[in-house]
């Protein structure tokens, strides 16, 4: 059985969607196992752009089954729209949703907004965090619960009362959600996909080849990321077992691949040691079109942080790294990479230490030649190859592939 795990090695937005699309064409089954519609994978196929938030990217291959596994939280409105947008690909009979996956409800989004006003973490306000919060408080509503109206209405009523009290007594805000209206909307969206609700654990276990698609990135992982400026799930390889229901031994023969940009970006608040708030940062953003596919927010940009990337490799066991957006660096005479932080030997776990981390840079010669759409290693400038070799040596991990542009065909193997 062939198993491939693709995970973002930075703060998300590394270009995983295209990589997954490229590598998944021979796989029988594709699995999303954590997160929700707080991340978007963008893929361009035959000139048409697809932005997928919940449905696995690999389902764009017409022979591939797509699984939304138990570790995900699902906004039924968003899922319904994605299925409709992909109607031409006839995905309805190839998409399976875990009966254990939790559902995002309107009160989760209200709570998200209220929490964000207090904490300013930089959440997408999609209700993701509060859905996970209620999951772990044992107050969540799962897909399977929609098949039993008594369970659903009891949970819904309890959660609406809890949210109403929180809104009115703690945040001094009116709460106007109506139980019957919420239920009507949920069942309207649920009925068309009810046939797709399955025990997805069994489907994965019996598949001959499986690709696992991570969302966000290692540095946003709830446990090993830059806490508290993280997402609400394990967006690293740590989330595989609990996100799918598969035991850890299942993954012992899997290949783990991390995807990283040739520089670093981050959306929202949180520590970012190599951030550039100057014309170089602006150039990276403009030339790299660095705006979030889900939020449209401009991304913060900076030089490649090898300290953070090495930490991601070590904590996730990456067998290979795939480097994206190398072509964005074509415009620079010199390129810097962070090889250490002042006063810190290891990647800090303390927020205060991370905010005070000062990068120590190594300056490498730029290539000032186009690598855009390069599809052959022999066509790459020597300085670009030197840059890749420096990264490999520092990480002690092979860079196996480059993405050199947005089109599906813009890539090369090393």
UniProtKB/Swiss-Prot annotation:
Residues binding IMP, per UniProt: 13-16, 38-41, 124, 138, 216, 231, 297
UniProt EC number: 6.3.4.4
Cysteine disulfide links: none
Compartment annotation: Cytoplasm
Record's cofactor remark: Binds 1 Mg(2+) ion per subunit.
GO molecular function terms attached to this record: adenylosuccinate synthase activity; GTP binding; magnesium ion binding
Any one biological process term the GO annotation gives: IMP metabolic process
Amino-acid positions noted as binding substrate in the UniProt annotation, renumbered to this chain: 293-299
Protein residues bound to GTP: 12-18, 40-42, 299, 325-327, 403-405
Primary location group: cytoplasm
Enzyme category, top tier: ligase
Pathway the protein takes part in: Purine metabolism; AMP biosynthesis via de novo pathway; AMP from IMP: step 1/2
Record Gene3D superfamilies: Adenylosuccinate Synthetase, subunit A, domain 1, Adenylosuccinate Synthetase, subunit A, domain 2, Adenylosuccinate Synthetase, subunit A, domain 3
Residues of the active site: 13 (proton acceptor), 41 (proton donor)
Classification via CDD domains: AdSS
Subunit (UniProt): Homodimer.
Homology family: Belongs to the adenylosuccinate synthetase family.
Protein name: Adenylosuccinate synthetase
Gene: purA
């Amino acid at each position: 059985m062939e198993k491939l795990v693709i995970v973002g090695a930075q703060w998300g937005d590394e270009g995983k969607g295209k990589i997954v699309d490229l590598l998944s064409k021979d796989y029988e089954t594709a699995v999303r196992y954590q997160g929700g519609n707080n991340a978007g994978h963008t893929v361009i196929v035959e000139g048409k752009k697809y932005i997928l938030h919940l449905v696995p990217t690999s389902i764009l291959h017409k022979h591939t089954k797509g699984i939304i596994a138990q570790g995900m939280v699902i906004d039924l409105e968003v899922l319904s729209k994605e299925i409709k947008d992909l109607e031409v690909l006839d995905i309805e009979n190839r998409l399976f949703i875990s009966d254990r996956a939790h559902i995002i409800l309107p009160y989760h989004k209200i709570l998200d907004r209220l929490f964000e006003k207090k904490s300013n973490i930089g959440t997408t306000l999609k209700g993701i965090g509060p859905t996970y919060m209620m999951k772990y408080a044992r107050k969540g509503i799962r897909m399977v619960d929609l098949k039993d109206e008594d369970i659903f209405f009891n949970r819904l009523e309890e959660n609406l009362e809890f949210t109403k009290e929180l809104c009115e007594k703690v945040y001094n805000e009116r709460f106007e959600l109506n139980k019957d209206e919420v239920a009507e909307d949920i069942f309207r969206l649920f009925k068309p996909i009810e046939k797709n609700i399955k025990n997805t654990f069994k489907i994965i276990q019996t598949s001959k080849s499986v690709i696992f698609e991570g969302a966000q990135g290692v540095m946003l992982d709830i446990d090993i990321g830059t806490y508290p400026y993280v997402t609400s799930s394990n967006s690293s390889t740590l989330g595989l077992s609990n996100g799918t229901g598969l035991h850890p031994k299942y993954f012992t023969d899997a290949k783990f691949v991390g995807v990283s940009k040739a520089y670093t970006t981050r959306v929202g608040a949180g520590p970012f040691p190599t951030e550039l708030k100057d014309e170089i940062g602006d150039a990276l953003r403009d030339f790299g079109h660095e705006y979030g596919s889900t939020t449209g927010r401009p991304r913060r940009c900076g030089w490649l942080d090898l300290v953070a990337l090495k930490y991601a490799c070590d904590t996730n066991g990456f067998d290979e790294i795939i480097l994206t957006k190398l072509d964005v660096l074509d415009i620079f005479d010199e390129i810097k990479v962070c090889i250490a932080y002042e006063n810190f030997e290891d990647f800090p776990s303390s927020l205060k230490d991370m905010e005070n981390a000062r990068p120590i840079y190594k300056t490498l010669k730029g290539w000032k030649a186009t690598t855009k759409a390069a599809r052959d290693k022999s066509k790459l400038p020597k300085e670009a190859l030197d840059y890749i070799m420096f990264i490999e040596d520092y990480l002690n991990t092979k860079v196996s592939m480059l993405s050199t542009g947005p089109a599906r065909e813009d890539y090369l193997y090393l």
